[in-house]
Amino acid sequence: MSIVLIIVIVVIFLICFLYLSNSNNKNDANKNNAFIDLNPLPLNATTATTTTAVATTTTNNNNSIVAFRQNNIQELQNFERWFKNNLSYSFSQKAEKVVNPNRNWNDNTVFDNLSPWTSVPDFGTVCHTLIGYCVRYNNTSDTLYQNPELAYNLINGLRIICSKLPDPPPHQQAPWGPVADWYHFTITMPEVFMNITIVLNETQHYDEAASLTRYWLGLYLPTAVNSMGWHRTAGNSMRMGVPYTYSQILRGYSLAQIRQEQGIQEILNTIAFPYVTQGNGLHVDSIYIDHIDVRAYGYLINSYFTFAYYTYYFGDEVINTVGLTRAIENVGSPEGVVVPGVMSRNGTLYSNVIGNFITYPLAVHSADYSKVLTKLSKTYYGSVVGVTNRLAYYESDPTNNIQAPLWTMARRIWNRRGRIINYNANTVSFESGIILQSLNGIMRIPSGTTSTQSFRPTIGQTAIAKTDTAGAILVYAKFAEMNNLQFKSCTLFYDHGMFQLYYNIGVEPNSLNNTNGRVIVLSRDTSVNTNDLSFEAQRINNNNSSEGTTFNGVVCHRVPITNINVPSLTVRSPNSSVELVEQIISFQTMYTATASACYKLNVEGHSDSLRAFRVNSDENIYVNVGNGVKALFNYPWVMVKENNKVSFMSANEDTTIPFSVIMNSFTSIGEPALQYSPSNCFVYGNGFKLNNSTFDLQFIFEIV
């Protein structure tokens, strides 16, 4: 018994000694800022549906590695697998990116020949280049697929970024550079952390990357909608929510828990895209609005790739897929050409990703409340942005302030087989349809703030009518900020062509210094070779006439109209980079708001017998294409008839149409005996009333 007792005492003594020794080790470890957190979640997080746990690591504010317990490993692994499987496709939908980077690496600046710690644009380049390398590392057909050296460079790049970031983050100012230059730190940088961590999830670097992501996104993206003291909404928050959600998964939260967070709920309310009648979001006619009153598709395009992540995270039902599809159809094309009036403030007609978003039908699309008409045919894309007092006609910022004419007056078609020729500093002021008030085309509307400012028209009325293959838009506009420029604009899209008439063009009297105005019919970027002769050479070869002048698959013609003074076509080069076909309008007629111009554009290789007439009065313009399509512009009404279908709309947005308007219209197009049957309206008093005017404002009738 005594021997047994002695053994027991010795064992107890050893246990006590080991316990005390272990406690001292822990205390020493705590002095070195290391800790073990076996339950990093708050108490209510223990209800997670996935309870599998795995040990991993995290960091403290000195970037030293510490232990972490992952409570939702299956959900984490599933998402990371899905992310890698879809990375290349997702990247193809991402507008801001560096594709197939090949920059040399640098242990101080991440990449050679950049100054990312003083230049925010260079920091953005570093971020986008790192993401581009992640795509290469993950692409099985790339020569850098799972390259060990690249893996090291990626984690090292992440380390370098972390070593430069202020801890704690600055409040309402960027870590370096201009105070308000926050974008890359809030939007792009978190995506870098997510991309690097996930593509390295089968390497020795994963634990370190995950711990860095948990720590630094906890500082710079503490919620899905907050960063560096700012609260972000709309397109910005959509981008923020994707890496934020991943960082929360890394912290052990389940997707069900993350969904309940206030910031995530804000984003889900945004991406649900309920139809709205004002403010940010998807308007009832499926036009995307941002900055309260701006058709700002740049934000939607930049965020579009995130929608797949949200449907993975939280289910298919979180996105208004039907509305979003229509929103893209309303403005886009498979080639990526987009009407500039809904695009970026710097003036662009092209998105490198929008063509990948959906399958585009050949159709005519109209947004009756937001005033956009678009036609996509086999041969061309065309679109016009009208005006309404509810929405801005232009938004400027301290850098971009000369694009208002482009946004409001672009009237052209793009041959789908032609080259995509985007604007540059020399060409952005010169586009078909723009009414020039000076020879250099510059019309500045500066922002009155340190950020963006939007401008609404003094007069903003638009009517749209469409059939199966034709669409017409009638615009009555006046812009105080553009020298009180006013006009009525009549545009008709039809097979292989477009008709354009401006009348009642006017400006503030005595404001042009006795310089004639001009309407641009066709513009040529002389720096791009399309195998077309110069406009001047074409004119000389055509007996000193610019009829039929061609550029990049589009042909222009003057359209005469009875009893309207339509100027001849002339050629001019405002600078060495641009050549124009124009119609000159006298400053005297502009002072009295009686100037006019009229032309048509056709797809090269196609012609038509289009004719236009003024019927009875200045406000009644009849256009006959000659292939069953007729249009009538009789302010405030516009009508399009195609074979057995006819549609009407009023620029006053009337929900009733008098019988007299219909009968007078049929008389004006030479078909007074037409019999018709309503398709979306019913007899109401002395006319018809729309069945439902919630989403559109066109009256549609079948000819019987």
From Swiss-Prot:
Coiled-coil features, chain-numbered ranges: none
Consequence the record notes for mutating H291A: Complete loss of non-sulfated chondroitin degrading activity
GO MF term list: lyase activity
Effect of R345A: Complete loss of non-sulfated chondroitin degrading activity
Site, as annotated: Transition state stabilizer: R345
Source organism superkingdom: Viruses
Marked site: Important for catalytic activity: E395
Annotated EC: 4.2.2.-
Effect of N236A: Complete loss of non-sulfated chondroitin degrading activity
InterPro entries associated with the record: Baculo_ODV-E66_core, Chondroitin_lyas, Lyase_8_alpha_N, ODV-E66_C_baculovirus
Pfam families in UniProt: Baculo_E66, Lyase_8_N
Signal peptide residue numbers: 1-23
GO cellular component, one term: membrane
Active site, per annotation: N236, H291, Y299
Cell location: Virion membrane; Host nucleus; Host cytoplasm
Top-level class of the enzyme under EC nomenclature: lyase
Keywords associated with the record: Host cytoplasm, Host nucleus, Lyase, Membrane, Signal, Viral envelope protein, Virion
Main localization of the protein described in the UniProt heading: virion
Record family assignment: Belongs to the baculoviridae E66 family.
Function, as annotated: Component of the polyhedra envelope. Plays an essential role in oral infectivity. May digest, with its chondroitin lyase activity, the chondroitin sulfate barrier of the peritrophic matrix of the host midgut to facilitate viral infection in the epithelial cells.
Name of the featured protein: Non-sulfated chondroitin lyase E66
